[in-house]
From Swiss-Prot:
GO terms for cellular component: host cell cytoplasm; host cell nucleus. One of its GO terms (biological process) is symbiont-mediated suppression of host NF-kappaB cascade. This is Protein A49. Belongs to the poxviridae A49 protein family. InterPro entries: Orthopox_A49. The lineage of its organism: Viruses, Varidnaviria, Bamfordvirae, Nucleocytoviricota, Pokkesviricetes.
Amino acid sequence: MDEAYYSGNLESVLGYVSDMHTELASISQLVIAKIETIDNDILNKDIVNFIMCRSNLDNPFISFLDTVYTIIDQENYQTELINSLDDNEIIDCIVNKFMSFYKDNLENIVDAIITLKYIMNNPDFKTTYAEVLGSRIADIDIKQVIRKNILQLSNDIRERYL
């Protein structure tokens, strides 16, 4: 898929967009169907593992995050932005992103998770902040926010990126 996106071949790009559109719609429906069966502790652990680049794609919300990450990664702006920050700015970014977890806005929560994933690609930050991330996210219950906002967020992502 990535080669098609970057090749400039219009047919390949249109196929990629169609595939990602379908995947995002499908996984959003699966999240709605399965979210109640996922224990909150397991959901939070899987979110932390996703951030730390160890994804459990059997969890539909993690599959949703992975799909969104793939779509957004094509824009490639996030990596460049993170790489342009110094350590203090990254620490400020981590603190600010954590605030998103305490708001009832799924778009902000997903943005925070994906930004933290980009930051944790740096082994130094992963080593330093892995434990803090795990303990902070363990206290959060986002199932209600997911259930309430997943379809709207999915539509917004498709409109914005595809």
